[in-house]
Amino acid sequence: MLRSVVNNNDKAKESEQSVRVATDDPTYQSYAFQPSTSSSNISWFGGLRTKLSQLSLFPDWMSQLGIKSDDEKMETSSTSSPQSEQSIGEYDESTLVFRPVQLDHFGGAGQEDDGEQVDIWDFGATFLADLDSNHVWNDTIERQHFGPLKDLITTGGGANKINNHSFKTHSLLHPTWCDKCGDFIWGILKEALKCEHCNYTCHARCRDLVTLDCRSPGSSLASSTEFDSIYPQLDGTLGTIPKGLILPPAMSSSTGSDKENGNGNSAGISAENPIFSVKNSFTLPKSFSPVDSLRTKEPSAPPESRYATLRVVERYVKEDTPFEWTDEYKEMDLERKIHSYNSLAKGMEITLHEDGVNFGGHIHVNMNLSRPISVVQGVIPPTVYDVVNTAKSTAKTTSLRTITSFFLPRNTAKVINIDSKTTARKMIVTLLKKFRVADNPRKFALYECEQITDEATCTLNRKLTRISDDACPLKVVLNWQSPHCGRALVLQENDTGDILWDAFEIPELENFLRILGMEEKQYVFQTQQKYQQYRYHLDAELRQRGHSVPDAAAQPMVQTNPFLDEEFLRNQDEYGTSDSMLFSGTIKNAIMGEDPDYVNLEYLKKQNMDQSTNL
């Protein structure tokens, strides 16, 4: 590690902020900076922070930005070693926490964590202790979990653009996130693009940047390329199956791939999903039951009448109140409930802690994701050139990282270890951090899936209940009394409109309200202007045909909504107030002096009015 240190005590105050620190550690490459030599900027920032520190919400906001207060700095300096005062940042590999450079003194950050590495699926108290810090629990709209996501190279799907998606304009009834850039898509007048086959959702501006192949939700593991068989083709009937033979359906495994589940000649499960509207079907016997599937039954009817189509009906239930706050959950006689659960859960036991209140154990989480996820790769090791020329190119060289998008196989099951104090939101955030998933944690939600089979109608009723972010998944599992009761924890996209608006910051909520009010006024103005245009051209047509019109309507002017803040709109680019919101093309065209998209003046002028009334 190369460092240039100023040891002159007389010039220490003058050159304290101009000390140039260089390092060959690849961890710090993404935080390379050009130190400022002006002391006026530092004093200006210190005075501004002193003025703003009088506000009640300022300390929390500063902590989210990574700038510590004076009390936190004293605690950090008291616990740090002399070696830590020389580093410019801190990198904790077990929790992937990035802490920025302090503006007051560049050499006053903490040291690296020398503790033992936590198991990849161990979400015990050692790992969850860091979730209380502001650096980890920074679940904002922007993707900030792995440091600044800059200088990334897209590797998923190759470097060429993919055009096999069937994108359709999709009106957003509920807010969501873009699968390409990860920005927030929100607004009544906003229209996103959604693929009909793989549910890929993105901005209109991100369509040309998509490099991921289209893949239907039911074939996430199926290969898109067909390879020729290496075996020769045999003539005759050698090894063939008679056409009149009816084969029983192959029983599929819950953890197998789609090819193992019988995605061959016979179809899949007929699923009616209100979110994705995906429908497949495969043939199963009428006597099929998930509980009694291993039990052999005698055929009671001819083979042709023993088969029917299994119909799967999914019903989503919103859970507003945390489960442990309801009357159904009781913490009385906790030791007896844990003993009863462990007698049926072999290998998934729950252990009661010494305090007699908290407990921990293993749970199954099925990751049923239909939309792609983006994974950030770690820092690339430095080359020999970077090590030799570190002192010259530290301020110009940035760390090169990659981000890869792919479809996670459906029903991917993971076993994790949590305790009774871990909430659903913390578990989701921690799980995504371990996978280095760059998607916003609010994009996902945890559901409790309950399956009930109706043999009379050959229907599998699946009830998905949203587990509140404040609820503890381990307490929910303990209330099942058995891990084999037909229930499971499912992690999937939060596309049911259950966005927790109370988790946003106050400036973000105020911005949402302002944009929502502007869009409401713009929508009303569009409707009024549309019918004024029709009235004007109808009156003109009646006068042309010789009919007397008592009150001739004046031609309305094509202009923007006078209720909108034009100065505010002029300062917006095509990305809106930030990279996470879009303004409609109507507002943009009106500002630029063009005709709005919702009024087709050329058609009304050139065509007859009897044809224009069919619009």
From Swiss-Prot:
| Keywords annotated in UniProt | Cytoplasm, Cytoskeleton, Metal-binding, Microtubule, Zinc, Zinc-finger
Q: Where is the composition biased (Low complexity)?
A: 76-87
Give me the Gene Ontology terms describing cellular component.
Answer: cytoplasm; microtubule
Q: Which CDD domains does the record associate with it?
A: C1_RASSF1, RA_RASSF1_like, SARAH_RASSF1-like
Residue ranges of every copy of the SARAH domain listed in the record: 498-545
For the region Disordered, give the residue spans. Answer: 1-29, 69-89, 249-268
Point to the regions of Polar residues compositional bias.
251-268
Indicate the segments forming the Ras-associating domain, all copies.
396-496
Q: Does the keyword Translocase apply?
A: no
Keyword Metal-binding assigned: yes
A GO biological process of this protein is: positive regulation of phosphorylation
Highest taxon listed in the record's lineage = Eukaryota
Localized where?
Answer: Cytoplasm, Cytoskeleton
Q: Which PANTHER family match?
A: RAS ASSOCIATION DOMAIN-CONTAINING PROTEIN 1 HOMOLOG, RASSF
Cited function: Involved in embryonic morphogenesis. Plays a role in the organization of apical filamentous actin in epithelial cells of the developing embryo. May play a role in let-60-mediated vulval development. May induce nuclear condensation. Positively regulates the oxidative stress response, and this may be in association with the small GTPase rab-39. Not required for muscle integrity.
Name of the protein in question: Ras association domain-containing protein 1 homolog
Gene symbol of the encoding locus: rsf-1
